[in-house]
Amino acid sequence: MSDQTFDAPVWHHGKALRKGYTTGSCATAAAKVAALMVMRQHLIHQVSIVTPSGVTLCLNVESPHVEGQQAVAAIRKDGGDDVDATHGMLIFARVTLNDSGEISLLGGEGIGTVTRKGIGLPTGSPAINRTPRHTIETAVREAIGPSRGAQVEIFAPEGVLRAQKTYNARLGILGGISIIGTTGIVTPMSEESWKRSLSLELEIKRAAGLDRVVLVPGNHGERFVREQMGIDPQVVVTMSNFVGYMIEEAVRLGFRQIVLIGHPGKLIKIAAGIFHTHSHIADARMETLVAHLALLGAPLPLLTLVSECDTTEAAMEHIDAWGYQRLYNHLAERICQRVLEMLRFTQHPPACDAVLFSFDNQVLGSSRPLAAIARELTC
């Protein structure tokens, strides 16, 4: 049985919704139990892991097999009541011990391969995102000890078929699914319920006396604020895709400064007046980049290159190569302008700032000097 945090349902309109776990948790658990089996030389039918969010999962093991220096195990993906394309499929891990002292991670059958730049993984590598890579390697290292080496292969026999129901091909991930998950847990929640829970966090912070708030899309933004800006996480609230809603809630509650911090892939949509940033509502990332590059006098070849990109990261590589890094300060200023336009009928609109950062936590641009923004947030 998993811990109470996981077992507790999410309630929505009087209905209890069951949580699930990510493909990253499945791969981590499968790799851990395979490593344990090859060390102990017997089958194991249940395994527990601690997810990045601190939740303990106790999962049933399927198809366990051990022979000599190699073991294989599978975990069945369970998305809870948030069913997606990978729900119910088996995620396998094959662990082979060696004397290298290193842990190598491979993507096997049904795991997609990265074929384009722009998603934070090297071209040609398996589509296993950073957090699952870390949790897999950590779990295997704990199982085999500090000196042994191991080759870990993650595979999913249904992956090719299941991937056809995802956006992987559009992102240049071919041949299978992605192993993903920053928290390890899938939490089902309707949009309205989700928005209300985010707003509640704003209310709690305002009640505690805070009148300045940092709004971030998700975990990456929170980490950037803490590690790169040295700002107390107490002032940070996740806005997810609900930018306009959370800004309006911050105004309603009387916050006098709002700072939007995030990756351009999300925040540049605000520069186009898009205040719900989920892709099913609107995209316009490349169009926004092209328009503002043109305003800065960028040449047509660069505009063409950017317009043909599928991801913001890919476009950013072209922007950097052509020396148009000043675009990011321009976009940050434009984001603030758009926010103030949205609040033009507000009697006492808050001050607004924006900060853009890259996937490797480097500051790209800001509406004002970053030091001044950080200093005000720590007052």
From Swiss-Prot:
Reaction catalysed by this enzyme: Co-precorrin-5B + S-adenosyl-L-methionine = Co-precorrin-6A + S-adenosyl-L-homocysteine
Keywords: Cobalamin biosynthesis, Methyltransferase, S-adenosyl-L-methionine, Transferase
A Gene Ontology BP annotation from the UniProt entry: methylation
Superkingdom: Bacteria
Sequence intervals crossing the membrane: none
Entry's EC annotation: 2.1.1.195
Family, per entry: Belongs to the CbiD family.
Record-given protein name: Cobalt-precorrin-5B C(1)-methyltransferase
UniProt organism field: Klebsiella pneumoniae (strain 342)
